Design a protein with these regions (language model features):
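Extended, highly charged segments
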Residues: 1-267
Length: 267
């Protein structure tokens, strides 16, 4: 529908679905939706490239590299000669650096929603013919799904930071919102230094951390939106207990949450 937005129709044994994704700098997203959007009279070039290659393709694998804000779709399709080919559609949800990138099976970029030349980024070009490289955003962080409560305490205690910042700067995939939620559940002030708390208090924080990670590993999610009156403030796939003065509404799926949140933000 837009230059930085895609709406894919997916067909499977359980019916048809629409997958909406956007690389908007202000509101990047990806979610399943029942809503169709009116297509422009002239489709964006990137959309035409995708139609040419994967209009009748089959998604064979969907995965997230580590805890990165990236989702990869591996797709197989038949080319004009009837040969089986493989492509990868990648969405990177990284604020103003968000992008949707389409590559060959060997990682060569075919095209992207946003082309990034060397004049814009000397670190990472995103242009047809270039090799795709994953953004180096989480390399120095720990995987939170493999850390126990004692390791957690050792890691954050080594940083002269506030509780919240020590958490989200140490572990991949943990946002300031989640870090604040962990502090709240443990009864700690997210903005106080880690050094202000005793070892036992930090162990209690570590226990809350591991409990949350167990919920994530076992797909125990609580999709919700936090509103101040009618204004959406936050959304999350985990239960948020830190907003006692605001309205927290739970929903059946994270896709429902995302569609509501972004539609309300845009009105």
């Amino acid at each position: 529908p837009e230059a930085d937005e895609l709406l894919l129709t997916l067909k499977g044994p359980n019916g048809s679905f629409r997958l909406s994704m956007s690389a908007s700098a202000s509101l990047p997203f990806i979610y399943l939706t029942p809503t169709n959007k009116v297509s422009p009279l002239t489709a964006p070039t990137f959309c035409m490239v995708l139609r040419k290659h994967i209009a009748n393709g089959r998604i064979t694998k969907i995965y997230q590299p580590g805890m990165e804000r990236i989702i990869n779709f591996e797709i197989e399709h038949l080319n004009e000669m009837g040969d089986l080919c493989h492509k990868v559609l990648i969405i990177e949800l990284m604020g103003k650096y968000s992008n949707i990138i389409f590559t060959d099976s060997d990682g060569t970029i075919i095209d992207s929603a946003k082309r990034i030349p060397a004049s814009v980024s000397s670190v990472r070009e995103v242009l047809p013919g270039r090799a795709y490289t994953i953004p180096a955003t989480q390399e120095d962080k720990y995987n939170p799904l493999t850390v126990d409560s004692k390791q957690f305490v050792d890691i954050i205690s080594a940083k002269p930071l506030t509780v919240s910042k020590a958490i989200y700067s140490s572990f991949s995939g943990i946002s300031p919102l989640v870090a604040n939620e962990l502090a709240h559940r443990a009864g700690l002030d997210a903005d106080s230094p880690v050094a202000a708390y005793s070892h036992d208090e930090l162990l209690h924080l570590g226990s809350n951390f591991t409990w949350m990670m167990e919920d994530i590993k076992n797909n125990r999610f609580t999709p919700n939106i936090v509103r101040d009156g009618n204004e959406p403030k936050e959304f999350s796939s985990i239960e948020l207990t830190q907003y006692s003065d605001l309205t927290v509404t739970k929903y059946e799926s994270i896709s429902e949450v995302l569609e509501l949140y972004y539609s309300e933000r845009n009105t």
